[in-house]
Design a protein with these regions (language model features):
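Short, well-structured N-terminal submotif of metal-dependent ribonuclease cores
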Residues: 1-37, 49-58, 135
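Alpha-helix capping/helix-boundary segments
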Residues: 8-9, 38, 99, 116-117
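Acidic catalytic patch
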Residues: 36-39, 59-90, 101
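Entry/capping segment at the start of metal-dependent catalytic domains
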Residues: 42
Length: 136
C-alpha cells in the first residue's frame, strides 16, 4: 500500500507527462490510500478543468467515479494533533501534512511530485521515479 496525493490521482486519470509512469505505479502497487481530504481537493481540480472547458461535466462525474474506485475502502481520517505537529515541524500546508500523517499511520510512503513535500519529508515522501528505484 502507498498513500497517493491528489495530484498523483489527477495525473493518473487525466493525460499528463506522468501517465506512463503512473500506469506502471498502479500496476506495481494498486493499493492506494488517501485521507478523506482528497475528495475536496480533487473536486477543486475538476472545477478548474470544468471552468477552463478542458473537460465536460459528464467527464468530471466519470473521473470522480474512477477516482472513487481507485481508493475504494482506503480512505482514512487522520489525527488533527499529528497534522498540526507536522505543520509545526515544516513549512508545508495542513493539506499536505494530512497525506504525510496518513503515510506515518499506515507505515508506508507518500507518492507525490510536490517538491516541497519531497524536500521537507524525505523519509516519508517519494517521487514516482524514486518509488521505482526503491521497489525494483
Amino acid at each position: 500500500m502507498i498513500v497517493a496525493d491528489t495530484n498523483i490521482i489527477t495525473y493518473f486519470l487525466l493525460p499528463s507527462s506522468c501517465s506512463d509512469d503512473l500506469d506502471a505505479l498502479y500496476k506495481a502497487e494498486p493499493d492506494w490510500a488517501v485521507p478523506t481530504l482528497w475528495r475536496s481537493e480533487f473536486r477543486n481540480v475538476l472545477a478548474l478543468y470544468l471552468r477552463k472547458e478542458i473537460i465536460t461535466l459528464k467527464q468530471a462525474v466519470r473521473l470522480v467515479e474512477n477516482a472513487d474506485s481507485i481508493v475504494a475502502h482506503n480512505e482514512f481520517t487522520v489525527s488533527s494533533a499529528e497534522v498540526l505537529t507536522l505543520v509545526d515541524q515544516s513549512s508545508c500546508s495542513a493539506y499536505d501534512c494530512e497525506f504525510i500523517a496518513l503515510a506515518h499511520t499506515l507505515e508506508t510512503q507518500l507518492v507525490t511530485q510536490d517538491k516541497k513535500v519531497l524536500r521537507e519529508f524525505p523519509e516519508t515522501a517519494v517521487s514516482i521515479s524514486d518509488f521505482f528505484v526503491h521497489h525494483n
